[in-house]
């Protein structure tokens, strides 16, 4: 959507993750008074410094008490050390005291974007916890981020500023709830693929900070809007496999995984979900592609960037090829699978294809 807006092309976006929608809305809001943002930034910094001056930053017990005040259940104490967390909380309070509306959202987004750098969280590519950072220059990180945002906002043209870019929170499997049928010329997406990645973890701190997900139940609500791509995102009521159960190529994959599980004597709860995950993934993608077909204009195209996978008992899953079969069954024509790049597996010493699948209505 950002590229579309830069090119003057109207766009819509749908995402299941509350924070990703919030982030997109901030990045696409270019009707901003930069002078007012600069002035508000100075007021926020002054308010922050006044509050920080009243804290004994060497009193570890006092810092711990401040850090734990109103701590969300989902914010594990290992994720961010007490001192940086207290600074983040002071900065958020300063933003809330000095701003409102769209201006406030912009500054809260700036804080969200510095959470990972000042925290102990790391990605490799999965969610992990690194060496604790006892302190971090939160204020400088915030100042630098806002200054960068202002530089970008001052560079846009009036045409770019006026170009429509709408991002909605929703489930792509119900796309016609948000987008009119036969209204879209081109769709571009990089959906989940069956690699056992739990996608809410990639924005866990941000979801907690913004209050979108503060406990297991609220995270589960978000995950249920997502395509099933992880064994931690499978539910009893899932039933979309019915859309693809008669596709022999998918059954070959699940049969091979099942055979290897039995051969290895696999008994863990997650391993028992492997084949269900594959069925629900391709079923969910079938539901999504069906909806995409409805909103595309005749001759319109959808482009999907997906990776192959070896995540389940080393069985090779050719994601783009299988989705091509699914798409053609739904009525798409002129399918193409184009190699985007070869990428290194993060858990094994080999390369995987990352392909672009192009389908036409």
Please annotate each region the language model reported:
Residues 297, 349-361:
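Core SAM-dependent methyltransferase catalytic element
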Residues 70-79, 272-283, 306, 310-321:
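Acceptor-substrate binding/catalytic loop of class I
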């Amino acid at each position: 959507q950002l590229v579309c807006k830069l090119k003057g092309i109207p766009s819509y976006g749908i995402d299941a993750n509350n924070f990703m929608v919030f982030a997109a809305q901030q990045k696409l809001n270019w009707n901003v008074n930069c002078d007012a943002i600069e002035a508000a930034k100075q007021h926020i910094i002054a308010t922050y410094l006044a509050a920080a001056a009243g804290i004994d930053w060497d009193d570890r017990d006092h810092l711990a008490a401040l850090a734990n005040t109103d701590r969300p259940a989902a914010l594990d104490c290992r994720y961010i050390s007490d001192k940086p967390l207290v600074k983040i909380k002071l900065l958020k309070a300063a933003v809330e005291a000095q701003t409102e509306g769209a201006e406030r959202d912009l500054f809260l987004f700036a804080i969200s974007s510095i959470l990972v750098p000042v925290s102990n969280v790391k990605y490799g590519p999965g969610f992990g916890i690194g060496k604790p950072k006892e302190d971090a220059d939160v204020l400088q990180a915030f100042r630098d981020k806002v200054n960068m945002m202002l530089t970008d906002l001052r560079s846009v043209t009036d045409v770019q500023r006026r170009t429509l870019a709408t991002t909605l929170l929703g489930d792509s499997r119900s796309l016609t709830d948000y987008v009119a049928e036969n209204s879209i010329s081109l769709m571009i997406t990089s959906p989940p693929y069956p690699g056992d990645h739990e996608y809410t973890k990639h924005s866990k701190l941000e979801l907690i900070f913004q209050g979108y997900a503060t406990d297991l139940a609220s995270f589960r609500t978000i995950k249920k809007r997502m395509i099933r791509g992880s064994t931690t995102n499978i539910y009893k009521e899932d039933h979309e496999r019915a859309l693809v159960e008669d596709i022999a190529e998918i059954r070959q994959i699940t049969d091979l995984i099942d055979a290897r599980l039995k051969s290895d004597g696999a008994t863990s709860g997650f391993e028992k979900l492997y084949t269900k995950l594959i069925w629900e993934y391709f079923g969910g993608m079938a539901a999504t592609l069906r909806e995409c077909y409805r909103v595309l204009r005749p001759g319109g195209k959808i482009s999907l960037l997906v990776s192959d996978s070896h995540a389940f008992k080393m069985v090779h899953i050719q994601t783009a090829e299988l989705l091509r079969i699914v798409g053609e069954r739904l009525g798409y024509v002129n399918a193409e699978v184009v190699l985007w790049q070869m990428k290194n597996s993060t858990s094994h010493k080999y390369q995987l294809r990352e392909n672009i699948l192009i389908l036409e209505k």
